[in-house]
């Protein structure tokens, strides 16, 4: 999945899957786009076009959407389904999909891959089906039509499919659900109804061994656009004061603020693998990668999902599994009080080790490779 908005999850998952196939001795090509998310590819690449949000002219979209993200304006619009996400990013635009499918088909026709793996890329599934190539890919419970869909957003895709002589389901999500296998980077405890042809694979990479060390900081990361940068920084200050520890706020401009004898360090990005083993709490937006990162290092989670369907699903799943708490309103004081509650009440995080063990047992990227090898022979 390529998109103009800042979303590192799809690319990082695609990279991990690619490495798993490489480790098993397979040749891999990565389709990528100039969207600011696709960097440092681990395999040879094929450049594909990047959709323009809402089908707007590219020159406008390049400037307006990053600005809206920084101001937190994106978080004010409810997003009810993954179909709406595809529409907002421009991935359902008929002209874009036609161009992407043609380019991908040309590449597939020339190279004849044994299988296509789609990281929520609709054009890849359509192109593979048109070329008669097996297609598998990533999936999740909240991206199924049974969970939520918005068929009115997919009229252009239906026209294109009819023109290509293919079935044109009401919802574009049905196309993604029709892949030969759907690999769920989660577990039944968190996503009990993942849909047809679902294979749970848990952590894509083997999690590191955990060694005892002081938990002496809090990490805050709200992703792209769901919470204004100023609110994230104020939440960091509240957390530093109430928990009496240093706080790191990712996804904002560089700064260091003193709160008593503690510091709130802000930066566009940090190495989470260095900070999470030290973290008492991880406060985040509910993205899939953030949820898995917290569980990897057995860190209690505070999720502030905003008005996005998938993040709300993840927040509820984490809370029900006793791995953290959700806070619906992005108010710094509420976030800090929830963090205190997590630390003071062990029962609220009593499920973390069990869920981590379940995720670890499901096979990860190696499981994906084995399933695909059996599928295509």
Language-model-detected regions and their locations in the chain:
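A short, glycine/small-residue-rich beta-strand->loop->alpha-helix junction that serves as a flexible
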Residues: 3-15, 39, 225-230
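Donor-nucleotide binding loops and adjacent catalytic segments primarily
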Residues: 18, 198-281
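Conserved nucleotide-sugar phosphate-binding/catalytic loop shared by glycosyltransferases and other
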Residues: 23-24, 28-88
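Conserved nucleotide-sugar donor-binding subdomain of glycosyltransferases
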Residues: 64-115, 156-171
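Conserved nucleotide-sugar donor-interacting segment of glycosyltransferase catalytic cores
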Residues: 93-158
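A donor-sugar binding/catalytic signature common to diverse glycosyltransferases
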Residues: 116-119, 269-315
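A nucleotide-sugar donor-handling region in carbohydrate enzymes
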Residues: 147-227, 250-254
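Conserved donor-nucleotide binding/catalytic region of nucleotide-linked donor-dependent transferases
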Residues: 325, 330-333, 340-355, 362
């Amino acid at each position: 999945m390529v998109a103009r908005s800042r979303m590192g999850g799809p690319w990082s998952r695609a990279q991990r899957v690619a490495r798993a196939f490489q480790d098993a001795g397979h040749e891999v090509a990565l389709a990528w786009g100039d969207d600011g998310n696709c960097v440092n590819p681990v395999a040879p690449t094929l450049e594909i076009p990047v959709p323009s949000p809402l089908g707007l002219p590219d020159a406008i979209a390049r400037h307006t959407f990053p600005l809206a993200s920084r101001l937190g304006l994106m978080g004010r619009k409810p997003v009810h389904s993954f179909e709406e996400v595809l529409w907002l990013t421009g991935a359902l635009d008929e002209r874009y999909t036609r161009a992407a499918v043609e380019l991908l088909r040309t590449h597939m026709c020339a190279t004849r891959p044994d299988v296509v793996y789609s990281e929520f890329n609709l054009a890849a599934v359509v192109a593979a089906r048109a070329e008669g190539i097996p297609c598998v890919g990533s999936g999740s419970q909240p991206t199924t039509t049974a969970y939520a869909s918005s068929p009115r957003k997919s009229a252009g895709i239906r026209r294109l499919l009819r023109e290509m002589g293919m079935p044109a389901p009401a919802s574009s999500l049905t196309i993604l659900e029709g892949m030969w296998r759907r690999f769920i980077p989660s577990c039944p405890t968190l996503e009990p109804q993942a849909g047809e042809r679902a294979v749970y694979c848990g952590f894509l990479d083997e999690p590191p061994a955990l060694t005892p060390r002081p938990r002496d900081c809090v990490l805050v990361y709200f992703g792209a656009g769901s919470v204004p940068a100023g609110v994230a920084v104020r939440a960091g200050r509240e957390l530093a004061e109430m928990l009496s520890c240093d706080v790191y706020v990712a996804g904002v401009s560089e700064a260091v603020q003193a709160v008593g004898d503690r510091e709130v360090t802000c930066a566009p990005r940090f190495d989470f693998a260095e900070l999470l083993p030290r973290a008492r709490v991880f406060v985040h937006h509910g993205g899939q990668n953030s949820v898995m990162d917290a569980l990897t290092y057995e860190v209690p989670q505070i999720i502030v999902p905003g008005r996005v369907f998938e993040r709300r699903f993840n927040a509820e799943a984490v809370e029900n599994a006793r791995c953290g708490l959700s806070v619906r309103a992005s108010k710094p004081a509420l976030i800090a009080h929830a963090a205190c509650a997590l630390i003071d009440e062990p029962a609220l995080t009593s499920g973390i080790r069990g869920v981590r063990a379940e995720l670890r047992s499901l096979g990860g990227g190696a499981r994906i490779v084995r399933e695909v090898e059996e599928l295509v022979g």
